[in-house]
């Protein structure tokens, strides 16, 4: 890193993770632990979008609540050409993007040119993670919206009824250096999520909604300062999940997401993500007719004002769902809440309100299990967030 980058990174580090001194960002030497980003299990089922219709996807995966990786769903995105590190560095060189939050919950931002220098050259244990939710509101950064389309499988977006400024944060554009990631979480408000990966590789561990929080969450005893970071989870909790004493009903589904693949995480699933190399991705949370009952119970509890506007719009645009709200038991057990401490869905950085707000972030029976080595040469050029989206 050049001297200008080092100066700015030091300032950002102190703001984004005030609990760490500058000389503690590399105290565990995770940069040298290649097991974290090396060979791992790849168990999650894959489907081919070229021979799977939207209706088939809904009936086989969304409705049953089954995580899956989808291939050839985003092959036509301009992002594959426009989101190379070189082109992003030129086009958005002086634009500032969110890489964390300070102790007051305010965004900590960094210019793209400094972040990319840092991303390619740092040796931090858990590097800063560019995780931007407001890119669609900025005159220059909103051009990113032209580079991708919401996949057909996830085209139903009921929260759009309440308006762009009233709805909770729901989309994140992210660049993750190797070893960055998001801590264990459930996505906010019962929403489901999809993550489209343009370059690099992501390591996922996904657990059933019924998995007890105390089994999955690192404690202060496990990690006094970095307990919410994705890499901490893989160092501390992951080995426990592989031990014979780990309850089989809470077994982990492991996956490696490759460039061009989309991962679908149904609402309620715990998930944790680690960037195995430099990654560029976009992720969105959504409410559809399928997950609406679970989302409604959480919205009416935690966002009462928005719920009134939502219901008002549903009566006009989706009277069938408006009638359904009268039958939903909002006091019933709707499963685990999302974590405000999740790190977007992502963690080295997320947004205050998903990757989780007052709920947590997310990611079974596996039909195929095989070992897939990760080729370090296949690298594509290429804090915890209050609201954690799908990393």
Regions found by a protein language model. Name each.
Residues 269-271:
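Short, charged beta-turn/beta-strand-edge "cap" motif at the junction between a beta-strand
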Residues 1-262, 274-391:
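N-terminal accessory scaffold of Fe(II)-dependent oxygenases
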């Amino acid at each position: 890193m050049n001297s200008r980058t080092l100066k700015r990174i030091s300032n950002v580090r102190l703001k984004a993770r005030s609990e760490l001194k500058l000389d503690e960002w590399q105290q565990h030497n995770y940069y040298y632990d290649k097991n974290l980003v090396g060979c791992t299990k790849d168990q999650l089922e894959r489907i081919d979008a070229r021979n799977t219709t939207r209706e088939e996807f809904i009936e086989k995966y969304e409705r049953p609540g089954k995580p899956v990786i989808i291939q050839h769903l985003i092959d036509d995105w301009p992002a594959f050409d426009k989101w190379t590190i070189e082109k992003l560095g030129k086009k958005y060189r002086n634009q500032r993007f969110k890489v964390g939050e300070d102790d007051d919950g305010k965004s900590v931002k960094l210019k793209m040119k400094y972040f990319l220098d840092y991303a390619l050259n740092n040796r931090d244990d858990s590097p800063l993670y560019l995780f931007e939710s407001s890119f669609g509101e900025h005159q220059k950064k909103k051009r990113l919206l032209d580079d991708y389309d919401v996949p057909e499988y996830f085209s139903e977006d009921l929260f759009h009824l309440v308006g762009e400024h009233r709805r909770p944060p729901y989309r994140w554009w992210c660049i993750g250096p190797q070893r960055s990631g998001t801590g264990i979480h459930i996505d906010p408000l019962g929403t489901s999520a999809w993550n489209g990966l343009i370059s690099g590789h992501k390591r996922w561990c996904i657990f059933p909604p019924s998995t007890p929080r105390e089994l999955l969450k690192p404690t202060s005893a496990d990690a006094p300062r970095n307990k919410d970071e994705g890499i901490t989870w893989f160092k501390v909790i992951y080995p426990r999940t592989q031990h014979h004493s780990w309850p089989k009903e809470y077994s982990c589904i492991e996956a490696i997401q490759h460039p061009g693949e989309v991962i679908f995480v149904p609402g309620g699933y715990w998930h944790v993500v680690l960037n195995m190399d430099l990654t560029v991705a976009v992720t969105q949370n959504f409410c559809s007719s399928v997950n609406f009952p679970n989302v409604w119970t959480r919205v009416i509890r935690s966002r009462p004002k928005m719920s009134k506007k939502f219901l008002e719009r549903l009566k006009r645009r989706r009277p069938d769902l408006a009638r359904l709200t009268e039958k939903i038991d909002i006091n019933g057990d709707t499963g685990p809440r999302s974590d405000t401490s999740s790190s977007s869905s992502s963690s080295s950085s997320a947004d205050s309100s998903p990757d989780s707000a007052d709920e947590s972030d997310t990611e079974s029976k596996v039909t195929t299990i095989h070992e897939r080595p990760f080729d370090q040469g296949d690298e594509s050029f290429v804090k915890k967030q209050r609201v954690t989206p799908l990393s």
